[in-house]
Amino acid sequence: MWVFGYGSLIWKVDFPYQDKLVGYITNYSRRFWQGSTDHRGVPGKPGRVVTLVEDPGGSVWGVAYKLPVGKEEEVKTYLDFREKGGYRTTTVIFYPKDSTTKPFSVLLYIGTCDNPNYLGPAPLEDIAEQIFNAAGPSGRNTEYLFELADSVRKLVPEDADEHLFSLEKLVKERLEGK
């Protein structure tokens, strides 16, 4: 079983895996539209973390992890708990960056618009302000944003995730202005 990471699963890998590959999935875009009251915010003052939204023609780069044989259910149970804040699972096709490896199915955690923590779209400036001000049990929301942006930039320098990098720029401007 393979699991696709497009948010904190890219840079905070706290579960065992057998192999990992950089690549992308299609027909989605990454957006900071999911609220976090359990990791990067608190009830009443949620942080914002990424989810995926359907986007015909879109693509999202990330990392696929092969779960260890015999431990798939154990690791999936852990990931179900870690991604408990309104995420459900689905299966999609993953396209490895290394084109000599054929595409294959991966498990995907996605926060849909009908979950209680879904915040949805907002002006980028408002999302940046919310990220700038939020913190929770797993740390500041700014750390989540910066770790994700740095990781995507290192893994896939050619990825021009405008939403991610625009938010990074806006939040850094707020930090410098403080």
Curated annotation (Swiss-Prot):
UniProt GO MF annotations: glutathione specific gamma-glutamylcyclotransferase activity
Binding-site positions, substrate: 3-8
Source taxon at top rank: Eukaryota
Chief localization: cytoplasm
Record GO biological process: glutathione catabolic process
Presence of the UniProt keyword Acyltransferase in the record: no
Function description: Catalyzes the cleavage of glutathione into 5-oxo-L-proline and a Cys-Gly dipeptide. Acts specifically on glutathione, but not on other gamma-glutamyl peptides.
Protein's name in the database: Putative glutathione-specific gamma-glutamylcyclotransferase 2
Gene (name only): Chac2
